[in-house]
Amino acid sequence: MRTLEAFALSLFLVFLVKWVNSDSSSSPSKDQFLSCMSTHSDSSFINPKSFIHKPDSRVYTDFSQSLISQNYRFLTLNFTSQKPILIVTPRTDTEIQRSLLCSRKLGVKVRTKSGGHDYEGLSYLSLHSPFIILDLVNVRSIEINLADETAWVGAGATIGELYYKIAKSSKIHGFPAGTCPSVGVGGHFSGGGFGAMMRKHGLAADNVVDARFVDANGRIYNSRREMGEDLFWAIRGGGAASFGVVLSWKVKLVRVPEKVTCFRRNLPLTQNMTKIVHRWQQIAAELDDNLFIRVIVSISGGSVQTTFQANYLGGIDKLIPLMNQKFPELGLTFQDCSEMTWIDSIMYFNWKKGQPLETLLDRGQRYNDLYFKAKSDFVKNPIPEIGLEGIWTRFHEVESPIMIMEPLGGKMYEIGETETPFPHRRGNLYNIQYMVKWRLKDIGVMEKHVTWMRLLYRYMRVYVSASPRGAYLNYRDLDLGMNRGVNTSFEDAKLWGFRYFGSNFKRLAIVKGKIDPTNFFRNEQSVPPLIV
């Protein structure tokens, strides 16, 4: 394990980019790219200069700085890799198609960005150059169809924009995606998509019913029927960036009650916190499917505290008796609870009361101006109290550690582990997201916090899933292993692939071998092609 961690860190030190200092002016590819795009122009094709941004443009500079600010850890490492030769912000299918064809013709790598929330920056940074960023920010139309209770969502939209559009169309519909509104649907849906309604309705990916997609040859598939069930299966949880570019998703809307109930209850360590968290582990995945209670562990006032944060698809009058019967240890009261609409519950999870609904349209990254490192786990058996106490002790060693524990069960147990690439279903009690944040730009401070995270992860190994130790793709972690260029073998990639996908990884690699046998769409943790 130490060898793997040292290898990951050593690669990390030459990975990604300190954009403010790097220079790609020596690369001839940007002018060749523009020439290629112009050559492919036709009457329906807008002047490529209107959506292709060179390093000397204001759009490029502002875009680069905004992306780096999503995790300043990349700046602390003083990376020396090349910055993108161009940033492409297409508006149409044709512009996306032509961008891919020219990239392939010129040997230029592609990084496809939806919301830019990849924890390791793989949607906008690259170890290898030259590369472009294909930013789908202008591909975010949303069409709600209440007649058949579906929506077509452009891959560049955020889940906040989707929630907003649903709320403006209906008071009795919602969608089971994440609680962070600025996350892009392109990555969120294609990696699975946890959310507060997943116990009732499953992951976001479980509710995708169709898609439009373009492959490395520029071929556009306008439906799942055209692309085939294998590819459609792969992009709903297997990370679409390994296979091509999703243009849009068709999702199934779900019915929500006119009133839902939320609560947020803080418990300091002195108030029997350990025993209550231990009890939560035993019951959270077995509760009524309408009830989602997650636990957030953090430091407050120099001491460890937990926040029990919940969303119940129903009224207070039904929630309180349920809690008294199943989880009386928490001591929930009417005063702790608030009834609201489903869309207001999304606001409740993110902002203080009184924020306008339009706040959901803010595409800004929630972790702006922070440095952070994250990891994930899945827990199959309750962690004993002594194990929890070991976590609390370690939380006092750094300034801003966070651990979010989200329960599975319900619909998550009804869906088989091979129905989508996301395999972490029945048998898993809850997922853990670990994160440590800091603000000081200093290599020593960065090393301290990243080392702390890795030591906590090592400590947790006896309490979590094993063989393989599960991980969640949308909480990407390059410590698990990385590809070594275009020729990474399936056997080498299994090191990290089985962590994310279990036995589904082989099927993903076979699909990759059919749709992208030359491995054009690749990054440091993309699925390698397996030709059979």
Swiss-Prot record:
Compartments it resides in: Secreted, Cell wall
Keywords: Cell wall, Disulfide bond, FAD, Flavoprotein, Glycoprotein, Nucleotide-binding, Oxidoreductase, Secreted, Signal
Signal peptide segment: 1-22
Cofactor, free-text remark: Binds 1 FAD per subunit in a bicovalent manner.
Gene3D superfamilies: 3.30.465.10, 3.40.462.20, Uridine Diphospho-n-acetylenolpyruvylglucosamine Reductase, domain 2 (3.30.43.10)
Any one Gene Ontology cellular component term annotated for this protein: extracellular region
Disulfide cysteine pairs (residue numbers): C36-C102
Tissues with expression: Accumulates in cell walls of etiolated hypocotyls.
Glycosylation sites: N78, N272, N487
Name used for this protein in its record: Berberine bridge enzyme-like 23
